[in-house]
């Protein structure tokens, strides 16, 4: 059996070998490996989120938004002192578009102020504001009241802004500066009522036109009336035009016309006169990174009398220093209308004539800043006046009113300085001082009614987003005044401190308080006109 298998194997080998010898060996040999194993990536486990709710968080999130601090240079303008020591207007209303502010004080003085805004501020904007205030002092007829309303509007086109204003001002003062032990006047006898309506319209370009010209002309009309005594109408037209001649040079021309018509009422002598000022102010301007110079002469006409006034001023920037040197020699004509002078002294009697003031100012000063928050300026001026109005008591009658005595020629060596520390809109501390050294008078013994020295300090602090605190302090040396028989004296110095605060209760309501004349210093700005003592007012503001 085994032999058979062996023989069969030999025969198979002999048969298969020739066949295998015929196989093509020129091709590559390939070995196929077949496997049932298949590699796969392992599935990762998913994160399982908790079904519990997050806890509520009602805290207010304040996103960081840093605004660079601004260095502001404040300009202080003289204001008249009313029987109330300080102006009751509050800076705390800034940023509120529509509000009603009401209050009451210890001097039987109601206070109300309202402000409304309309328009989107892009195509048009209209602002309507009104305020009323009155007070009653301890002296007979030491009363005061004022109602003011203003309508301001602007229309914005692609290249111009058309603006206008309509204002109403009703003000009651009283001549209470007489000897009350001798004279007994009724309230109507000493009433000094001013009624004023003022309108203004103008246009100014928003972008420089193809000719490279900037312009901003306006027309102002004022109707002023002193109850049963006088009326005065004024017309003012100003056209400033500026054209650029490149990056360094430009020219500017300003045309000014100021016309007043004055007439008395219910007086023994019928008084009527016109007062006209016409002034041309051409300027050639040179401006580069370090130097700015304005140069020119100003032909002017004062009631037909020709005057040529200087108009040269400029500033130099000190390289690599935060310092600017200012210099100049300028001149101007100042309209001494009854309205303008009564803003300074409301106890004037009617005019019999009117003279405008010619002013020439030779000055030098510096303006600078230190760090990011402090700015300051200093200015020395040598002023020369012609026909400067001085205020003297009417000693011929009852000494309760004032006359105008024009000084034909007077010099003033003036020094001004101011400094401010400002941190954005959160904190502001400003101080200013003015010294006047009048000399070389020709017609008057002293500069009656002028203040030799004045210091003003103002403080504003937004402690939180709901609480704001403010404070104002003023000190001045008394003005010289004239008594009977040419006896001259000076008013005692005056100091006035006021404080105020406002607290926002919610988005709609705020509470405010003002305390004026904290020292209870019953000083005088004008002889025989003592101001109120301490005055406390408080109330609420409704915002909507």
Please place each PLM-identified region on the residue numbering.
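Bacterial Sec-dependent N-terminal signal peptides
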Residues: 1-25, 249, 323, 459, ...
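N-terminal periplasmic/intermembrane-space "pro-region" immediately following the signal or transit peptide
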Residues: 21-90
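Outer-membrane beta-barrel translocator/receptor signature
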Residues: 80-85, 90-149
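Short loop/turn motifs that connect adjacent beta-strands in outer-membrane beta-barrel proteins
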Residues: 88-95, 120-123, 156-161, 207-215, ...
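Exposed, low-structure sequence patches enriched in small/polar residues
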Residues: 95, 100-103, 131, 290-292, ...
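Surface-exposed extracellular loop regions of Gram-negative outer-membrane beta-barrel proteins
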Residues: 117-135, 250-260, 265, 269-300, ...
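Flexible loop and strand-edge segments within Gram-negative outer membrane beta-barrel domains
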Residues: 135-142, 148-150, 163-214, 220-234
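Outer-membrane beta-barrel transmembrane domain signature of Gram-negative proteins
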Residues: 189-202, 218-289
């Amino acid at each position: 059996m085994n032999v058979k298998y062996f023989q069969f194997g030999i025969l198979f080998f002999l048969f298969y070998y020739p066949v295998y010898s015929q196989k093509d060996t020129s091709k590559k040999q390939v070995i196929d490996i077949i496997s049932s194993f298949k590699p796969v990536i392992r599935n990762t486990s998913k994160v399982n989120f908790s079904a519990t709710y997050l806890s509520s968080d009602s805290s207010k999130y304040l996103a960081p938004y840093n605004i660079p601090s601004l260095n502001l240079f404040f300009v202080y303008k003289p204001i008249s002192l009313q029987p109330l020591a300080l102006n009751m207007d509050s800076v705390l209303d800034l940023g509120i578009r529509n509000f009603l502010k009401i209050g009451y004080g210890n001097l039987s003085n109601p206070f109300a102020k309202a402000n409304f805004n309309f328009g989107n501020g892009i195509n048009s904007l209209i602002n309507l504001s009104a305020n009323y205030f009155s007070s009653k002092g301890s002296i007979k007829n030491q009363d005061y009241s004022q109602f003011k309303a203003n309508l301001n509007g602007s229309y914005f086109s692609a290249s111009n802004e058309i603006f206008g204003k309509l204002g109403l001002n009703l003000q009651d003062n009283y001549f209470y500066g007489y000897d009350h032990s001798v004279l007994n006047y009724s309230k109507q006898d000493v009433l000094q009522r001013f009624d004023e309506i003022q309108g203004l319209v103008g246009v100014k370009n928003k972008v420089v036109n193809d000719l490279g010209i900037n312009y901003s002309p306006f027309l102002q009309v004022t109707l002023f009336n002193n109850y049963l005594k006088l009326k005065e109408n004024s017309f003012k037209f100003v056209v400033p035009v500026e054209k650029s001649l490149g990056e360094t040079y430009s020219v500017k021309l300003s045309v000014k016309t100021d016309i007043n018509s004055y007439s008395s009422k219910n007086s023994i002598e019928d008084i009527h006169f016109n007062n006209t000022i016409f002034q041309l102010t051409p300027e050639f301007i040179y401006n580069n990174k370090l130097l700015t110079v304005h140069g020119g002469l100003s032909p002017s006409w004062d009631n037909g009398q020709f005057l040529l006034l200087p108009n040269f001023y400029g500033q130099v920037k000190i390289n690599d220093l935060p310092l600017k040197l200012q210099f100049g020699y300028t001149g101007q004509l100042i309209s001494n209308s009854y309205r303008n002078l009564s803003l300074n002294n409301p106890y004037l009697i009617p005019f019999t004539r009117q003279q405008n003031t010619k002013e020439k100012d030779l000055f030098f000063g510096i303006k600078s800043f230190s760090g990011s928050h402090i700015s300051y300026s200093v200015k020395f001026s040598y002023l020369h006046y012609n026909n400067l109005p001085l205020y003297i008591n009417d000693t011929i009658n009852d000494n309760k009113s004032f006359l105008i005595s024009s000084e034909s020629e007077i010099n003033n060596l003036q020094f001004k300085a101011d400094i401010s520390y400002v941190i954005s809109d959160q904190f502001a501390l400003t101080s200013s001082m003015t010294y006047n050294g009048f000399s070389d008078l020709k017609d008057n013994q002293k500069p009656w009614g002028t203040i030799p020295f004045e210091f003003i300090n103002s403080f504003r602090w937004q402690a939180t987003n709901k609480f704001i605190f403010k404070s104002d302090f003023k000190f001045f040396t008394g003005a010289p005044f004239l008594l009977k028989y040419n006896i001259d004296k000076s008013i005692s110095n005056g100091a006035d401190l006021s404080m105020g605060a406002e607290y926002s209760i919610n988005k709609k309501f705020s509470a405010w308080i003002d305390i004026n004349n904290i020292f209870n210093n019953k000083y005088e700005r004008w002889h025989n006109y003592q101001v109120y003592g301490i005055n406390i007012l408080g109330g609420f503001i409704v915002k909507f």
